[in-house]
């Protein structure tokens, strides 16, 4: 079955194994998106014809564009510009779709996001946080005309897009019950984490100055809590309200 409302945009660069992992998960679905658009940044290990041929039976709607870009958010904008569905689901190579998230999907929605640590173990799930302004972007089904990704933000353009797209916050969106996404938590450098947090603070002051009064201290506190401790909390206290603030 095809859900003609939904387009999937998958971003990849030099990650053939991760891309195949994502495509294999999509191929297992009973309800498929109308199109799967892979935006590749000019990988050395990707041969378009081989991938398309490999998935030609189960994913005939697969299209691949491979050319240099200005990074992940530029690639996401490229994918957005060529989608024909009314809804878009963005996935990175390595993300795994499970269940049947696209079945009867008609409007902007949230998908459950299961975190997987570096050892392949489940370590909690994402929650809408920061007053409804933050959620893993793989867990959001966007309208096709959502706010584009601002390339002036190198790390947090997805957060900026959420701020500008969902004026009432993400908590107003319905949650899909019959499927979701597994997201692998890779190692992020301290420098990148700090820079991304600075971008989030900048965006809050610019677009949500009232929220910034309350959220900037939370973001700073998160920087001070070691990642290992946050993972421990996610893994061992799933129902605890603290999860919503890390």
Descriptions of predicted regions:
Residues 22, 66-83:
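Glycine-rich, basic loop-to-helix element that forms the pyrophosphate-binding segment
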Residues 140, 146-147, 153-179:
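A short, conserved alpha-helix in the catalytic core of glycosyltransferases
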Residues 40-51, 92-94:
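A conserved acidic beta->alpha catalytic loop
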Residues 88:
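Short aromatic/hydrophobic "clamp" motif used to bind/position activated sugar donors
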Residues 33-42, 65-67:
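Short beta-strand/loop segment that forms part of the nucleotide-sugar
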Residues 24-33:
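Short, acidic, metal-binding catalytic loop of nucleotide-sugar glycosyltransferases
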Residues 95-125:
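Conserved donor NDP-sugar-binding/catalytic core segment of glycosyltransferases
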Residues 190-214:
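Catalytic core of nucleotide-sugar-dependent glycosyltransferases
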